[in-house]
């Protein structure tokens, strides 16, 4: 299984249960060329300089906004034996937040 694609963040133990989906459904997206994006709570970030999405684990750098403040940091993610994703988003010189995610399944209205 590849990391490439969109993952729905289902749990972030460091926050109250409803915080990750405060503004939109929490997610992390890994694309080709080491890019991607994520959103949880009031934080949005652009992923750049990521290692290969073809592996089962990835490390990345990111920059974005949290409550309208500029933030940046690093992150890691790894596919678990059950096919879920476990990772951590770290703020530079600051907090580290663990997350758990499942592959995003899209549904199209009929």
Language-model features: where?
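Short beta-strand segments that buttress and anchor functional surface loops
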Residues: 36-41, 59-66, 87-90
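Short, surface-exposed beta-strand-loop junctions and turns on beta-sheet-rich folds
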Residues: 43-46, 66-67, 92-96
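General beta-strand recognition
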Residues: 8, 37, 57-59, 84-86, ...
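Short, compact, well-ordered microdomains
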Residues: 71-107
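N-terminal glycine/threonine-rich, aromatic-flanked beta-hairpin/loop signature
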Residues: 6-9, 17-55
């Amino acid at each position: 299984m590849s990391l490439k694609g969109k993952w729905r963040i289902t749990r972030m133990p460091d926050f109250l249960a409803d915080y990750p989906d405060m503004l939109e459904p929490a997610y992390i997206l890994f694309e080709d060329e080491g890019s991607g994006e994520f959103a949880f709570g009031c934080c949005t970030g652009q992923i750049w300089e990521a290692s290969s999405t073809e592996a089962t684990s990835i490390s990345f750098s990111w920059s974005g906004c949290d409550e309208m403040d500029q933030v940046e940091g690093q992150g890691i993610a790894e596919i678990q034996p059950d096919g879920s994703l476990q990772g951590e988003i770290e703020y530079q010189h600051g907090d580290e937040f663990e997350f758990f995610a499942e592959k995003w399944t899209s549904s199209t209205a009929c």
